[in-house]
Design a protein with these regions (language model features):
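Alpha-helical membrane-anchoring segments
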Residues: 1-192
Length: 192
């Protein structure tokens, strides 16, 4: 609540915006978060603990629907008030996957992962569609994103000139790959 960007300040700004604008919209629609209930560190820790416990329940195969939904609600609640930190492509992908997985798991108290039960076809198709969306959008952005000065690092084959030292989760080998000749970068870009 008193961190770098306190989530309580964000929620209060949303609340005052709704009041000033005379909007007939719920604050829950603008920021769908159970952190509206309380903006204290204790409640934030409870929400995090709910997410952790429900993840363990999901791993154990216990009450999978409740576990997925409570994990999704916990993560969504934290993500919408932590946009500078949880606003990456994989955060949205994780939320979408959680939501679609709710329709994938069987309605049982305990799900044995070794069972041969087929998930519903619609659920499988929705997850395949999500995987296609990820791959398609990842490819489209390479050709439609223009940086400063109208340059496109993917079209110019220069994106890997800085990728290895600016990637979000760098590998120990990134330093060494960055030192390879630039022709390696260009060939790698052609094949991605």
């Amino acid at each position: 609540s008193k961190g770098i960007i306190p989530f309580g300040d964000d929620l209060n700004q949303v609340k005052s915006y709704i009041l000033k604008s005379n909007l007939e919209i719920s604050k829950w629609l603008i920021r769908p978060s159970i952190l509206w209930i309380s903006q204290t560190d204790i409640w934030l820790n409870i929400v995090i603990l709910i997410g952790i416990c429900s993840s363990f329940l999901l791993i154990a195969g216990l009450i999978p629907h409740i576990a997925i939904m409570s994990s999704w609600i916990s993560y969504l609640s934290i993500a919408v008030v932590s946009e500078p930190f949880l606003n990456f492509q994989w955060d949205a992908l994780l939320l979408e996957t959680y939501f679609l997985s709710f329709f994938l798991v069987p309605w049982k108290l305990h799900h044995d992962r070794n069972s041969l039960a087929n998930p519903p076809a619609l659920s499988r198709w929705l997850l395949w569609l999500l995987a296609f969306k990820l791959m398609f959008e990842s490819g489209v952005v390479k050709f439609t994103f223009y940086g400063v000065g109208g340059s496109n690092a993917w079209r110019d084959l220069t994106a890997l000139n800085y990728h290895f030292w600016t990637q979000p989760i760098p590998s120990w080998i990134s330093y060494y790959i960055d030192k390879l000749p630039t022709i390696f970068d260009k060939v790698a870009l052609i094949f991605t």
